[in-house]
A protein has these predicted regions:
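Short, glycine-/Ser/Thr-/acidic-enriched flexible segments
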Residues: 55, 68-69, 163-165, 189-191, ...
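Glycine-rich phosphate/pyrophosphate-binding loop regions near the starts of catalytic domains
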Residues: 29, 35-189
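Glycine-/charge-enriched secondary-structure boundary and capping motifs
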Residues: 2-12, 120, 124-138, 151-156, ...
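A generic structural signal for residues located within well-ordered alpha-helices
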Residues: 15, 19, 85, 194, ...
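N-terminal amphipathic/basic leader segments beginning at the initiator methionine
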Residues: 2-37
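Buried hydrophobic packing segments
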Residues: 27, 49, 93-94, 199-202, ...
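Acidic, glycine-rich loop-and-beta core segments that form the ion-binding/anion-interacting portion
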Residues: 179-214, 218
Length: 341
């Protein structure tokens, strides 16, 4: 009898198109919850369609941001907690867009893996959709890439992309910041999504198994805070001169990004409550204060520069919108850096 040679298939090479299609069907309910009126196409097209309502703006400016979650992803994968890492991804992007004064409009994600596990992928994307709900951004598309040999079977990586909008006259650049302005710090939920290569080194030194669900690991996996709604409410009543999202580089590197070169941030480190996880990291890793401040947010996820007369009202508005916030310093004459007192 003559043998029939069916030949190789894409699935034989490790790429399962049917699994990808099943994933799309599974995540549609999550994505539906993020839909905005401007979204004019369902998931599955070659591109996401979004009708820009430019008539609402005098001179609309689009603001874009893209980011990942760094090696925090490794902790989530090792512990098999996949539901919150998607919130981190959205937060890292929308918070960056927010600091320009923009409203996040839509979000797209990139999910790459060695072998597509529908349960894991849908759990991650459910978290992404949750982050989009919190921030008000529509999840209008994404890419799922199954790449055998590029990644181990259980490994996956994430990237996100966000677009927001702001009227040109309302763009926040930091150009108006002056000597005497007040700096407001808004609390973080933990390390957010930065400094995890150093954190993992501390865990290694302390022989802490990052595959076990300990209180330390849970604290380290707390999702990054999304500041969109609280800060958007604040912007309706208070002129924010500058905003710094405290990410990689910590307080030391991020505040100077919004300052003119003749100004300096004078920060009083006794003014806010530091999350205990940072003291744990510093103590168990024998990490200096200087290194902590230029690596981690140290309890402050967002810094706002405002006129000093608006300090009390700013703190009241942020508190009313569920944020812990403090007056952490002021602007002084200097050379563009941060002075700690």
């Amino acid at each position: 009898m003559k043998k029939t040679n069916k030949g190789l298939t894409y699935k034989d090479a490790g790429v399962d198109i049917d699994a990808g299609n099943s994933l799309i069907e599974k995540i549609k309910p999550y994505i539906k919850k993020t839909k905005r009126p401007e979204v004019i196409a369902d998931l599955g097209g070659f591109g996401g369609l979004f009708a820009l309502q430019s008539e609402k703006y005098k001179k609309p400016i689009l603001v874009s941001g893209t980011d990942g979650v760094g090696t925090k992803l490794m902790l989530a994968q090792n512990l098999k907690i996949h539901g919150t890492i998607g919130i981190d991804l959205v937060a890292m992007c929308v918070n960056d867009v927010l600091v320009q004064g923009a409203e996040p409009l839509f979000f797209l994600d990139y999910f790459a893996c060695g072998k597509l596990d529908i349960s894991i992928a849908s759990n991650v994307i459910e978290g992404i959709a949750k982050g989009c709900e919190i921030s008000g951004a529509a999840l209008i598309g994404g890419e799922t890439a199954e790449m055998p040999d590029m990644y181990k079977n259980d490994d996956y990586d994430l990237a996100g992309f966000c677009v927001g909008i702001v009227d040109q006259e309302n763009v926040i650049t930091g150009e108006d910041i002056q000597i005497g302005d007040t700096l407001i710090g808004i609390a973080s939920s933990g390390p957010h999504s930065n400094g995890y290569s150093l954190i993992r080194k501390v865990l290694e030194i302390q022989n802490i198994d990052d595959k076990k669900n300990s209180s330390v690991i849970r604290d380290l996996l707390a999702p990054t805070k999304i500041y969109v709604k609280s800060v958007s409410e604040l912007m309706k009543k208070i002129k924010i001169k500058g905003m710094a999202h405290i990410t990689g580089g910590g307080i030391t590197e991020n505040i100077p990004r919004i300052l003119n070169p003749n100004l300096m941030a004078n920060i009083n480190t006794d003014t806010w409550e530091m999350n205990p996880i940072f003291e744990w990291i510093a103590t168990h890793g024998n990490i200096s204060e200087e290194e902590m401040r230029k690596t981690f947010n140290c309890g402050i996820g967002m810094v706002l520069a405002i006129e000093s007369k608006d300090t009390r009202e700013t703190l009241e508005i942020l508190s009313a919108n569920g944020e812990k916030a403090w007056e952490i310093g002021s602007i002084i004459e200097g050379s563009g850096g941060v002075n700690y007192v």
